[in-house]
A protein has these predicted regions:
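Membrane-proximal helix-turn-helix segments that form the acceptor-binding/catalytic region
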Residues: 84, 148-149, 174, 198-215
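N-terminal subdomain of nucleotide-sugar transferases
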Residues: 5-8, 23-109, 280-282
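Conserved donor-binding/catalytic core segment of Leloir-type glycosyltransferases
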Residues: 253-270, 275-282, 288-290
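A short, active-site helix/loop in glycosyltransferases that binds the activated sugar's phosphate group
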Residues: 193, 211-235
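Nucleotide-activated donor-binding/catalytic signature segment of Leloir-type glycosyltransferases, i.e.
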Residues: 296-322
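Glycosyltransferase donor-sugar binding loop
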Residues: 286-298
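Nucleotide-sugar-dependent
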Residues: 75-79, 270, 314-321, 326-351
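Carbohydrate-associated surface elements
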Residues: 221, 236-248
């Protein structure tokens, strides 16, 4: 039972059993998806869930709470959504991080996963199990989820509802309307630039931009369109928590091979050809890639004897991984999607 601070969502009978069943379904579906794609070996087919960073130390934030509708699940690769949620909590604002990304019929309707330091991760079962990156919430589902969220609010009026994905547009509008609070859209990606995203998502996002009280953008290109329709646009680039990246203690010994590496998703935007060319041009260098393989073309790199893929690593291991590199890469293809990014991995490498 979570009964601390600004939110109260008591556990219900069978919640734990449903959570276990939902996780088992996730693993099974992920394994089938990978095997159908032709990847070899059951171990590599099973999807890995990288542990998310722990919530902030226990505290009692006194500011008005924030309703946070993020771009990724709390347990996904640690990036801007999780960093910003932690920063808001540490700044004294209780945060309700609504996690509706696990697509399972077996989940409890809602369950609080974390309740430390003013950060509350509320996992919710989304009726109909829509794909959050390709299918926006409909009005009826948004209304049902609004009632669930409002039922757990205690006393203080929230500071704002923050939306990071067009998927949440209807829910964000409904919460803002019911509570009479500002609607803030944090535009962190060119969403329609991702493979398979339908054009209608652009229409949903355009309305969200028009109706938001404030639009934040991580990069200049992402701020251009909002500025055409609203003066309330803030360029808010990414950054890095320097405390999490202490200066490395060891210095590379003379004569040891140069180590080149990358941390992040190995998706369609990853320039496989450029990395392969570099690997062939410098056969005495070692290349290390840390991240989930999301593009089958990455398999072509397996033929390089001086390159290894180490898989997804927890955020806690990123500083030591980067400290072991002589050169950090951000090898993105020239795409509309990549022209609009402000890569967190660049800040982390420079830290």
């Amino acid at each position: 039972m979570a009964r601390t601070g600004a939110f109260f969502y008591p556990a219900r009978p069978h919640d734990r059993a449903l959570t276990v069943a939902g996780e088992a379904e996730r693993l099974a579906r992920g394994a089938l998806r990978h095997l159908r794609a032709g990847r070899l070996g059951l171990a590599s087919a099973l999807p890995r869930r990288v542990p998310a960073a722990a919530p902030p130390a226990e505290s009692h934030p006194t500011g008005p709470p924030v309703l946070y509708l993020p771009a990724v699940s709390w347990s996904y690769r640690f990036q801007r959504p999780q960093h910003l949620a932690l920063a808001l909590a540490r700044a004294g604002h209780p945060v309700l991080y609504v996690d509706g990304f696990l697509r399972s019929r077996l989940l409890p309707a809602r369950r609080v996963l974390h309740t430390q330091g003013g950060l509350h991760v509320l996992r919710m079962r989304v009726p109909g199990r829509p794909d959050p990156y390709r299918e926006p919430l409909d009005r009826r589902t948004a209304a049902l989820m609004t009632e669930t969220i409002l039922a757990g609010l205690r006393h203080e009026r929230p500071l704002m509802v923050l939306v990071q994905l067009p998927f949440w547009a209807e829910l964000g509008r409904e919460l803002a309307r019911r509570l009479d609070i500002p609607l803030v859209y944090d535009r962190i990606d060119l969403h329609v630039g991702f493979p398979g995203v339908p054009v209608r998502i652009e229409t949903v996002e355009a309305r969200l931009i028009r109706e938001a009280d404030l639009v934040c953008a991580t990069a200049g290109l992402l701020a251009e369109r909002p500025r055409e329709v609203s003066p309330q646009v803030l360029l808010l680039p990414n950054g890095v928590d320097l405390a999490a990246f202490p200066a490395p203690a060891a210095v590379r010994q003379s004569g040891s091979p140069v180590v080149v590496g990358y941390v992040g998703a190995l998706g369609p935007w990853f320039d496989v050809e450029a990395v392969a060319a570099a690997g062939r041009a410098f056969p005495d260098w070692r290349f290390r890639l840390a991240g989930q393989v999301e593009d089958p073309e990455v398999a072509a790199l397996a033929g390089l004897p001086n390159l290894e893929t180490v898989g997804e690593i927890p955020f806690a291991d990123v500083p030591s991984f980067l400290a072991g590199l002589d050169v950090a890469l951000v090898p993105f293809r020239d795409l509309p999607l990549t022209r609009a990014v402000d890569p967190v991995k660049l800040y982390e490498a420079l830290a």
